[in-house]
Amino acid sequence: MTEGQAVPGVGDWEIDVESLDLEEDSCGTPLRATPPQEPSPAAADGEEDEDEEEEDEDVEDEGDGEEPGVSSEVPGRPEQPGGLAPRPPPAAQALPAAAAAPERGATAGGGAEPRKLSRTPKCARCRNHGVVSCLKGHKRFCRWRDCQCANCLLVVERQRVMAAQVALRRQQATEDKKGLSGKQNNFDRKAVYQRQVRAPSLLAKSILEGYRPMTAETYLGGTLPLPPPVSDRMRKRRAFADKELENIMLEREYKEREMLETSQAAALFLPNRMVPGPEYSSYKGTYSPTAGELPSKDFCNFLPTCLDLTMQYSGSGNMELISSNVSVATTYRQYPLSSRFLVWPKCGPISDTLLYQQYLLNATTSVQALKPGTGWDLKGTRVQDGLSAEQDMMPPKLEGSLVLPHLPEVPASRTDLQVHQVVPERSAFSPPGRNFSPIVDMDCLAAQGHVLTKLSKENTRPSLPLKTNPFHSVFQQTLSDKSGPELNAPFVKEAFEETPKKHRECLVKESQKYTFTIDRCAKDLFVAKQVGTKLSANEPLSFSVESILKRPSSAVTHVSQ
């Protein structure tokens, strides 16, 4: 009886454990029917840690490829204590017998049950050491939890790899749930980012290309643009990050382009082919031309040099203001000048006549080249060839209207004051010290020097610096019938007593086209004189953009009348 009581006690303990396992696992696995003594307390205590170990179970469930083999072993192990299992039915306990009978039938039936056994995760560390333990709630109480053997290290590494794969699959699953909308958003985001990146690259490309050739729309006549010799090379150099190398290459590019432009200067400065002021000044002001670039065969080639000389006076604030003023371009277009003379806009103060000074230098040397002597015939033919296109453009009606009606009314006091002014060491006739292209031949400079010596010897009164006076002293030969009585200085008559007669004879014989040009230049001079006041050379300009824009328009109305 004692044995019979003891046996049911053991059977009761086993049945209670099995019933707990059946309640935990809805599948009703027969594996846990007779657990071994070692993992049984772990399984009993593991009920508390079920929620904490679910993720590890998933990893082990996917990672264990050896479960089918374990399932074949486990059904054999309950056979050892299987002798205890038949003992409870003779004990005449209905509930334990009812609980044990289905397990025996399930174990004997086989069939679908072994497949369910493989689904139960087991502890891999315990398996390495020959023990099968259920993983649920087993992690904290595993005997080989901190084992460092080779097999356990391999298990740990495999678990890490499987966890990474699970995380990757979960991320991909969430992306698939979002569908194509997420991908479309990514594409839009990439497109916006690429647009933001490409905009500065286009700007850098335009900067690296340097001075781009002006298109045909910038010209009034629509001439061909300058050839772009370096744009392809600059595009290939966009990957370079050396700023110093970029500056050197751009400087070389400017010089090459300047040489090409000077060869086409005559075509660019025709009346219908004016270059806008800001573009020309921004390009020309960067690099000063070297000597010998301009050929002196054509008479009209002094015009780019004239602009270069005015650009060299950028040290004063007046020149910078005028060259950077946008109204310069409009005054270029509003002046109805001939094709061989380009006049800077008329400014009020005398200090602004620095702009006129270089033009006067070119104009007076060209007129002195026409004096009777060695170069008269040659220069006359050059001027005739150069001005042949002007005769068709100018109607003869403009002859009387080119000179303004207030020209004879210039006060004699101002004329005498400007006639008797001292010729400074550096006047409009003195060659500038900077390097620039030769304007006329050497015989013209020799004649000019002769006039300079006469003027400097006979003139002794110190006065204001000579600025617009050379223009008046030269062009009074054509206006002697109008303003001649007002000129009382004897040295002017001595210097140019032969020039007016022969010059007028030449103009009468040939045509009146050159007189038109000189009268127009004289008109601009007198307008500048009357507007001007007695100011020092270093005073700032007293004009605005509106005043500059208004004055040429009034001059145009005078000429049209």
Swiss-Prot record:
Biased composition (Acidic residues): 13-26, 45-67
Induction: Transcriptionally up-regulated by PAX3 within the dermomyotome.
Organism: Mus musculus (Mouse)
Domain of life of the organism encoding this protein: Eukaryota
Region (Disordered): 1-119
GO BP: any one term: positive regulation of myotome development
Name of the protein this chain belongs to: Doublesex- and mab-3-related transcription factor 2
Biased composition (Low complexity): 68-85, 92-106
GO CC annotation: nucleus
Family: Belongs to the DMRT family.
Subunit and partners: Homodimer.
Reported phenotype of the disruption mutant: Mice heterozygous for Dmrt2 mutation exhibit no visible phenotype. Homozygotes are perinatally lethal due to signs of respiratory distress. They have rib, sternal, vertebral and skull base malformations. Expression of myogenic growth factors, such as Pax3 and Myog, the growth factor Pdgfa, cadherin Cdh2, and the filament protein Des is abnormal. Mutants lack most or all of the epithelial organization seen in wild-type somites, sclerotome and dermomyotome. Mutants have disrupted production of matrix components including laminin-1 in the dermomyotome.
Task of the protein: Transcriptional activator that directly regulates early activation of the myogenic determination gene MYF5 by binding in a sequence-specific manner to the early epaxial enhancer element of it. Involved in somitogenesis during embryogenesis and somite development and differentiation into sclerotome and dermomyotome. Required for the initiation and/or maintenance of proper organization of the sclerotome, dermomyotome and myotome. Is not required for sex determination and/or differentiation in embryonic development.
Tissue occurrence: Expressed in testis.
